[in-house]
């Protein structure tokens, strides 16, 4: 081959010169093929190369988690020698370990002690690759002193591997992190081949030495290596052997190959600017965009590893450093975060690290087992016994989408077309020492190499877009496994909520909700509900009022999170967040809501239901539980550590009516809307029924017995079988007649009437009339009896009932007259205008209330002096109230209760004017205020007009001015069935504590205590049974 020809021939069908592609001639191809197909018997006999597949050979030695690769063809030249000194015979490579052979031990004895000069070979490094034969000869002459200093023999020995740890050279390299691997390429076979002794081989060797050294610094921090480095190291070995015939064993200590997220970031950042990228064992695609970086890397290797070589540092390298300052600063930050070496390598500057990080690895797919110690594993001392295993990727071709590996070496901008280098491939071979210790897989990196049989060369103008490169890199890294410590959370877990971290590490969580239910109140969302350790903020709107409710977490008792499991297609959310606050916190909630509907007596106000916009994610649920655990630990509520299930929460409010708790009324109106329990418990039993464990079986039973006029109560043990209530199916039996004979007008009470005295039953008219007669005859004073009259419960019903017009005798009568004719006989023996108080029980729509006609004989209000008896009685009652010596006997019910307001107003009227007011009026005493009061008052006024005409024979108008209607405040019922009981208690309290002063306003809120109502039904039952026994004894005697 002509030495004057500028450039070198590639081992391929293409030659790249100054950015242009030229086809090589068939003669050149045949010559290259002949050189690459020479086989060696020594290699076949002593090396395991034929056992490996592919067309490439790698030597890999595990040392401090590093990889050393050496080509078996690097026996052409040592480091540099004149072409005339090359031997005439061809070299053969023997693969062996110096620790295993006698040749290795003999060679170790011949090694010089001053091994520092071996590194001086890097002084021959120039700023750019030599492109002419003259430069090649000068480079080889520089290498002569090195080989002479080593006293190597003239013969060409076989290449052997030296354990670098046993030499001073190795001890020196152990102090600094060096390259991770050196790839030596081979394109023909794993066997030794005959080397050319021509001048071209020498020239190529000299040129390859420079380029090899330029990329060693880049291998220090990259997970993959370039194929041209392998070719240059192979040429380096051939140059050494052609010089003196002796070998210069040069071992490079690999650097740890543990990478963290910082390296990956640099890797992908540089990958976005690359051209067409593919993968192979020993070939690397260098980007044309980074020509300056490659050139800088070629001229910077020795300077970065040997501080003495600063004299040879070129000015071009300094300029390149200034141009790449921006990129280097970014890469320096990532490298500083990634590689925290305790002892930085001597002469290795941050700039060189930045340059190394910019090269893209395109033929190796790494599968790191990332751990917390990966950043520290870069230390040479800690990783000296670690190994890096290289294996052939069996299925990586599919991940690469069937593309063949391509390599492209772009010449730097300067017209140096002679820098085209020979690219050869090598098959990986694993070589390790027995003394290296066990392999540490924790910090190791598995390299998957893509073998390639066909070699293609890409032009620098063929580009690969960034999306394609990203897709290629992702496809190659599909098998990468990263530990959970460094792996970010799954974005699929994200939902509508947002977690806001606080600088004080306070937990905070937001949910989007649609509705909130608090007691009777239903509100719509006006933002997100916020959970913190100190408060829960709920913004919502009721009608037109916007409210921001803040719940103190110190008052939180339990919480629940329920999701429905049904598969209906309703658009409504089935995620409910439940909060249970303490009862003593209801006053604060009512103050914030400014809503009187929130009564503190109702248990329903303790429950807050939040209808979420959508079910929460698992990450949000864990965050919510953490917040609740913090609240529970702070406030001592250990029950907050776990949410309350639906089956345990539903019995708390299942007995409440939908009118009291809006959640049951709006959300749980349909069975499908009920939240389901996350488990099989909800499927086994309905939500409306408590579990069997909650049902307590009675241990005894009450028995009521009546025999021979005696009524007895006994207790017996609980029966084995379930007992059912047995109602009396016999004939109706009259228990009493009140008043008893011989008094006329007695009212009979039967055993069926006693049934309405059960809890939850409405009182019938018989019980109402009986007890009113009893109060008038037994409880009222004689004076009140003379001044009072009580109509039957049937009076008002008869007064207002509708009759057929055919039954009317005189159709010319008015409506009021016709009504009066229906009840005209009710007062034939009494003149109601001689009475002060007329009691009219009214039943409308199954609701009882009382109407009291006061002073019907008066036409206007009259003020009179208090009688002595009344004044003295009032003073006695006042003193009893002040001394709190009131008798609360439920049977006698002789207690006198007066309100403070009434007492104060009455005392004022007595002390100052000492007058009492008698006002004609109609008092409406209603415990529920649910009836049409105006119609009732108007009907009674019309009745009084007609009755006045009948009794007084004159006309008098009863209007709103002379017969006003008053509705004083009285004790109210707390259920829907005690209206009749309250009516009876109103009359009883009136007889015990009559209203003597009708000066407005009239306050009767504290007329009687509530516990009197609770025992009233039982008192009436006992009274009827007592009278029954008395009448039975009287009849028997």
Swiss-Prot record:
Compositional bias (Basic and acidic residues): 310-320, 330-340, 879-890
Keywords: Cytoplasm, Hydrolase, Immunity, Innate immunity, Phosphoprotein, Protease, Ubl conjugation pathway
One Pfam family this sequence matches: Peptidase_C48
Biased amino acid composition, Polar residues: 182-211, 253-263, 300-309
Biased composition (Basic residues): 1-10, 289-299
Region of interest: Protease: 747-1037
Active site: 847, 926, 979 (nucleophile)
Family from the record: Belongs to the peptidase C48 family.
Name of the protein in question: Sentrin-specific protease 7
Organism for this UniProt entry: Rattus norvegicus (Rat)
This protein's encoding gene: Senp7
């Amino acid at each position: 081959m002509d030495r004057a020809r500028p450039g070198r021939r590639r081992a391929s069908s293409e030659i790249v010169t100054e950015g242009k592609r030229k086809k090589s001639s068939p003669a050149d191809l045949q010559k290259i093929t002949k050189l690459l197909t020479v086989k060696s018997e020594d290699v076949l006999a002593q090396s395991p190369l034929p056992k490996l597949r592919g067309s490439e050979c790698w030597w890999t030695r595990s040392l401090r988690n590093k990889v050393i690769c050496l080509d078996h063809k690097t026996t052409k030249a040592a480091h540099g020698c004149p072409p005339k000194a090359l031997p005439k015979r061809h070299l053969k490579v023997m693969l062996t370990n110096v620790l295993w052979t006698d040749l290795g031990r003999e060679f170790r004895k011949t090694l010089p002690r001053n091994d520092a000069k071996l590194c001086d070979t890097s002084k021959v490094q120039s700023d750019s690759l030599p492109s002419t034969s003259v430069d090649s000869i000068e480079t080889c002459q520089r290498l002569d002193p090195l080989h002479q200093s080593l006293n190597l023999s003239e013969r060409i020995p076989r290449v052997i591997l030296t354990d670098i740890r046993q030499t001073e050279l190795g001890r020196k390299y152990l102090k600094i992190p060096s390259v991770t691997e050196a790839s030596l390429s081979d394109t023909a076979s794993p066997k030794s081949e005959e080397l050319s002794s021509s001048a071209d081989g020498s020239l190529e060797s000299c040129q390859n030495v420079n380029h090899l050294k330029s990329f060693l610094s880049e291998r220090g921090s990259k997970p993959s290596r370039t194929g041209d480095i392998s070719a240059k190291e192979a040429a380096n070995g051939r140059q050494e052997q052609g010089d003196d015939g002796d070998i210069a064993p040069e071992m490079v200590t690999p650097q740890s190959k543990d990478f963290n997220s910082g390296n990956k970031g640099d890797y992908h950042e540089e990958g976005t600017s690359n051209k067409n990228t593919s993968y192979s064992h020993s070939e690397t695609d260098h980007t044309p965009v980074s020509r300056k970086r490659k050139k800088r890397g070629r001229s910077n290797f020795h300077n970065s590893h040997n501080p003495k070589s600063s004299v040879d540092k070129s000015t071009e390298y300094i300029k390149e450093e200034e141009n790449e300052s921006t990129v280097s600063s970014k890469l320096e930050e990532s490298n500083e975060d990634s590689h925290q070496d305790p002892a930085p390598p001597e002469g290795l500057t941050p700039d060189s690290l930045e340059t190394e990080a910019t090269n893209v690895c395109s033929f190796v797919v790494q599968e790191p087992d990332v751990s917390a110690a990966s950043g520290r594993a870069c230390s040479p001392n800690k990783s000296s016994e670690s190994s890096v295993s290289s294996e052939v990727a069996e299925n990586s071709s599919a991940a690469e989408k069937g593309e063949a590996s391509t390599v492209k070496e772009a010449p730097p901008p300067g017209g140096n077309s002679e820098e085209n280098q020979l690219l050869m491939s090598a098959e990986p071979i694993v070589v390790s020492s027995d003394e290296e210790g066990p392999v540490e897989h924790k910090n190791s990196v598995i390299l998957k190499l893509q073998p390639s049989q066909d070699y293609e060369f890409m032009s620098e103008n063929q580009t690969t877009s960034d999306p394609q490169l990203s897709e290629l890199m992702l496809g190659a890294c599909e098998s990468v496994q990263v530990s959970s410590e460094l792996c970010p959370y799954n974005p699929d877990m994200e939902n509508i909520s947002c977690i806001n971290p606080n600088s004080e590490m306070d937990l905070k969580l937001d949910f989007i909700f649609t509705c909130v239910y608090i007691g009777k109140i239903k509100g719509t969302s006006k933002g997100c509900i916020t959970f913190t350790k100190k408060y829960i903020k709920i913004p919502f709107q009721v009608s037109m009022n916007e409210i921001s409710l803040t719940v103190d977490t110190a008052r939180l008792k339990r919480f629940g999170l329920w999701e429905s499991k049904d598969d209906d297609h309703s658009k409504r959310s089935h995620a409910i967040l439940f909060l249970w606050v303490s009862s003593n916190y209801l006053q604060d909630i009512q103050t914030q809501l400014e809503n009187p509907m929130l009564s503190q007596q109702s248990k329903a106000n303790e429950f807050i239901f939040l209808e979420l916009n959508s079910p929460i994610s698992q990450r949000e649920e864990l965050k919510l539980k953490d917040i609740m655990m913090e609240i529970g630990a702070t406030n001592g509520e250990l029950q907050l550590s776990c949410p309350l299930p639906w089956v345990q929460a539903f019995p708390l409010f299942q007995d409440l009516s939908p009118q009291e708790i809006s959640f049951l009324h709006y959300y749980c109106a349909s069975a499908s809307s009920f939240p389901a329990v996350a488990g099989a418990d909800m499927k086994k039993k309905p939500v409306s029924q408590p579990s069997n464990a909650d049902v307590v079986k009675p241990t005894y039973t009450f028995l009521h017995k009546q025999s021979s006029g005696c009524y007895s109560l006994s207790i017996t043990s609980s029966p084995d079988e379930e007992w059912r209530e047995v109602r009396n199916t016999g004939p109706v039996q009259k228990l009493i007649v009140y008043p008893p004979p011989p008094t006329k007008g007695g009212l009979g009470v039967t055993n069926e009437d006693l049934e309405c005295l059960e809890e939850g039953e409405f009182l019938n008219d018989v019980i109402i009339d009986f007890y009113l007669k009893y109060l008038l005859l037994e409880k009222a004073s004689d004076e009140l009896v003379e001044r009072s009259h009580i109509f039957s419960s049937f009076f008002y019903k008869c007064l207002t009932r509708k009759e057929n017009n055919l039954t009317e005798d005189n159709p010319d009568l008015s409506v009021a007259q016709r009504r009066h004719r229906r009840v005209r006989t009710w007062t034939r023996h009494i003149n109601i205008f001689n009475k002060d108080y007329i009691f009219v029980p009214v039943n409308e729509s199954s609701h009882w209330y009382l109407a009291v006609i006061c002073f019907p004989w008066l036409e206007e209000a009259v003020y009179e002096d208090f009688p002595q008896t009344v004044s003295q009685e009032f003073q006695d009652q006042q003193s009893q109230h002040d001394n709190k010596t009131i008798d609360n006997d439920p049977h006698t019910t002789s207690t006198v209760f007066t309100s403070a307001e009434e007492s104060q107003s009455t005392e004022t009227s007595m002390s100052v004017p000492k007058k009492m007011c008698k006002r004609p009026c109609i008092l409406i005493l209603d415990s529920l205020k649910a009836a049409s009061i105006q119609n009732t008052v108007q009907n009674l006024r019309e009745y009084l007009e007609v009755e006045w005409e009948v009794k007084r024979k004159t006309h008098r108008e009863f209007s709103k001015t002379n017969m006003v209607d008053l509705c004083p405040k009285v004790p109210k019922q707390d259920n829907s069935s005690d209206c009749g009981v309250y009516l009876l208690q109103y009359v009883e309290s009136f007889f015990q504590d009559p209203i003597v002063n009708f000066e407005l306003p009239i306050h009767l809120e504290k007329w009687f205590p509530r516990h009197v109502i609770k025992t009233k039904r039982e008192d009436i039952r006992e009274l009827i049974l007592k009278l029954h026994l008395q009448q039975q004894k009287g009849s028997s005697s």
